[in-house]
Curated annotation (Swiss-Prot):
Organism: Pectobacterium carotovorum subsp. carotovorum (strain PC1)
BP terms from Gene Ontology: menaquinone biosynthetic process
Enzyme category, top tier: transferase
Protein name: 2-succinyl-5-enolpyruvyl-6-hydroxy-3-cyclohexene-1-carboxylate synthase
Domain of life: Bacteria
Amino acid sequence: MSTSVFNRRWATLLLESLTRHGVRHVCIAPGSRSTPLTLSAADNHALICHTHFDERGLGHLALGLAKASREPVAIIVTSGTAAANLYPAIIEAGLTGERLVVLTADRPPELIDCGANQAIRQHALYASHPTLALDLPRPTPDIPASWLVSSVDSAMARLAHGALHINCPFAEPLYGADDGTAYQDWLIALGDWWSSREPWLREMRQSALAEQPDWPQWRQKRGVVLVGRVSPEQGARLAAWANELGWPLIGDVLSQSGQPLPCADIWLAHPDAADRLRQAEIVLQFGGSLTGKRLLQWQEQCQPQEFWLIDDLPGRLDPAHHRGRRLVADVGEWLSAHPAHKQAPWADMLVDIADKTQRQIDTHLASRFGEAQLAQRIPALLPPDGQLFVGNSLVVRLIDALAQLPQGYPVYGNRGASGIDGLISTLAGVQRATAKPMLGIVGDLSALYDLNALALLRQAPAPLVLIVVNNNGGQIFSLLPTPVAQRETFYCMPQNVEFGHAAAMFGLNYVRADNWEQLANTVTDCWAQGGVTLLEVVVEPKDGAATLNELVAQVATWAH
């Protein structure tokens, strides 16, 4: 019987076993060697298939789907450099915890290292970046179906975070008629598994949450709560929990905590704030990937008696290497096990400092249309019952420092490796998972880097506005002590482009806004009318970085 038919049976079983572990979305790039996987995914009614012609963007599309759905997402690509293009998304997932199941089709062993076309060494292709890897053999009916499903089940049961790389060699022929009866006995050997929804092998892993026995004593001390990347529900709970304790909470742009002490990356430069925070006896950090420069500096320099870092990702997440406790736990479960004890705030003056800072920023930016004003006013543009995706580089730092985002409002970003690749693709994946209106904001170089991902936005399930802040290059380098003589040529790299033609090429609406009123009205109209709009905001190249530096320099002069 045909090899192509058994390839299909093998791939059908592989895909079906993944659905038993919650895989609903599969992202597929075109390719011949991956034909058994692609056709099997298309035939599986439990799977939603997404396609993209660029594997780098495809990986980030899957990353966004996994980020928003909190479910494992599968990726199917062909052999060769197609598989290599998934590397950035796999690295990001390894750092931020999204579960990706990467199915790379491969040539059989006899075609490796002999000059065969599109054949590379795919064993351990992604080095240490996947959490797990499974190298499958060439499909053969001599291997029982129970081996394949139990191998997948075992790997998926251990995939708590990051990527699982499953390398899938297929021999030719890859195409051919399938009469539907061949090799059915191989599948039928699994019995009533086919009519169930359970994995073949159910591994039970129980990890009891370890309560800190001295928490009743520490919660009566002077504490500070730092919140990095957590979920909307966790951010809201943390805000209420810290408030009951009377502890100041400093929230990152991805904290979704409502940032009760807004503009922290500005007011942390005030000496009075530093003096008060120095009195903290315990610091609790929830989530990693802090953004703000002043916050990172304070976190590094603080010397409490105890430093606890709570996150469900394992490993070291504290670049300052504090002595303390690294607690691997779900944030919500940890809060339930460590209730607050109501007490009076010990650092009330920080509320006054933050309020004064926010008012001064309002005044400073009131008549200055530009990147900083846009960042500060982002909350006014958010769609009701929607979501925000924040790009990297300068824009995320400005929003982190200047805006106060609503508590519990979903905010997404790629702050693991913090690259500018794949941001639009990730945004597209997030929205496909939620089907909610979305506001996205990226810089011009980020948009150029992922320009062909505009093709993914044509299938947006809800209104979407993508703001491209065009400051003509990588102006994050204007914040850094890069050599002035070489800054433009070798760091900022201005491209002198506008995005109207790109939007037209992909059939997207396009607006260029030159003032706040036009920008705000355009966004409001988009939420009402639907569709996808690329909104380009051309700003003075150095204005955003210069404004941030000005505000940090001035904060010490503001009386509180």
